[in-house]
């Protein structure tokens, strides 16, 4: 039994249109299913947990973007972990998780991929905890510059306009220079198991990733995998503007040459601690919040998927 949960506003209505196509295909296949259209992230969480308890052997298929997937994963993880198999049909603007997991962005092809699988896969999730919140993520968590881009993009009418033209992944690029002006460098301490703390006095971008991509397909760390049991931390310092821009430009080019830059540091680990002395915007799978000065703990969790 498949239960589809659709965020009709994802991708500026793309999820709703995709569901129309998928439902038609399901009827043609005479495949037993049910569905639910969410009205908010809170509604999604409440419905998923309630339905999972009523129908424990159901496969839940999410139609939405990376943000919708984030809320579904946290509904499963909190307050107590549910034993749920999760499917996913990408209908957002960036779709970084879909790219990493090699899920087609064509709804009928994504459905065919899902139905062809006979057994679930166990994939890694990142888990984070601060003094006042905790959560899991399938893509990445960022402090500083990338979070600033996401914050500006999410509050920009241009994102919806680009989504209408199927150019949603370019929404982040359009807010790049505004974020560059707004974000300031900050002091950051990174603590890894069995290593002394590492201090950065001019941190500008700090991203913990579970897979290669962020920002709508930019390859941050090409070697990252969804099933390697590890998180990768990337820190870029901005000691001058030209140096930072050159590193970011290299990130957009093939070859991963940005990883050779002196201002970039990366670490692969199963858990870590970040400490800041100033408030920072944080983005998690494209959702943002303000992180007060303090400690941010991260480690690996896992979730069963089928796609």
Each language-model region and where it sits:
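ATP/NTP phosphate-donor binding region
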Residues: 1-63, 70, 74, 108-111, ...
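Catalytic core of DAGKc-family lipid kinases
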Residues: 78-202
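Glycine-rich phosphate/pyrophosphate-binding beta-alpha loops
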Residues: 146, 205-221, 288
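ATP/nucleoside-binding phosphotransfer catalytic cores, i.e., glycine-rich phosphate-binding loops
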Residues: 192-195, 200, 219-221, 225-307
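Short amphipathic alpha-helical segments
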Residues: 16-18, 73-76, 99-101, 219-220
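Hydrophobic/aromatic beta-strand patches that form the interior of the parallel beta-sheet core
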Residues: 36, 61, 87-89, 206
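Short glycine-rich anion-binding loops that position phosphate/pyrophosphate groups of nucleotides
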Residues: 65-68, 91-94, 143, 211-212
């Amino acid at each position: 039994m498949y239960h589809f949960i659709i965020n009709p506003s994802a991708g500026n209505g793309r999820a709703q249109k995709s569901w129309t196509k998928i439902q038609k295909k399901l009827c043609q296949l005479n495949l037993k299913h049910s569905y639910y259209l969410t009205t908010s992230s809170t509604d999604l969480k409440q419905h998923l947990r309630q339905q999972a308890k009523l129908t424990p052997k159901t496969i839940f298929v999410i139609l939405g973007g990376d943000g919708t997937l984030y809320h579904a994963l946290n509904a499963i993880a909190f307050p107590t972990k549910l034993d749920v198999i999760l499917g996913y049909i990408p209908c957002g603007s960036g779709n970084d998780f879909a790219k990493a997991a090699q899920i087609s962005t064509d709804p009928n092809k994504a459905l065919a991929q899902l139905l062809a699988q006979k057994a679930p896969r166990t994939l890694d999730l990142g888990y984070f905890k601060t003094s006042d919140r905790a959560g899991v993520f399938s893509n990445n968590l960022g402090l500083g510059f990338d979070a600033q881009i996401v914050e500006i993009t999410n509050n920009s009418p241009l994102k919806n306009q680009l989504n209408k033209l199927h150019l949603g992944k370019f929404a982040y690029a359009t807010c790049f220079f505004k974020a560059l002006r707004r974000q300031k460098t900050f002091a950051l301490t990174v603590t890894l198991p069995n290593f002394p703390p590492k201090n950065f006095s001019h941190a500008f971008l700090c991203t913990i990733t579970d897979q290669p991509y962020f920002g709508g397909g930019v390859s941050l760390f090409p070697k990252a995998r969804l099933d390697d049991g590890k998180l990768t931390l990337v820190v870029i310092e901005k000691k001058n503007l030209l140096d930072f821009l050159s590193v970011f430009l290299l990130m957009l080019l093939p070859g991963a040459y940005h990883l050779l830059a002196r201002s970039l540091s990366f670490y692969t680990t199963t858990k870590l601690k970040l400490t800041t002395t100033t408030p920072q915007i944080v983005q998690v799978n494209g959702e943002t919040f303000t992180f007060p000065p303090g400690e941010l703990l991260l480690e690996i969790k896992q979730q069963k998927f089928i796609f």
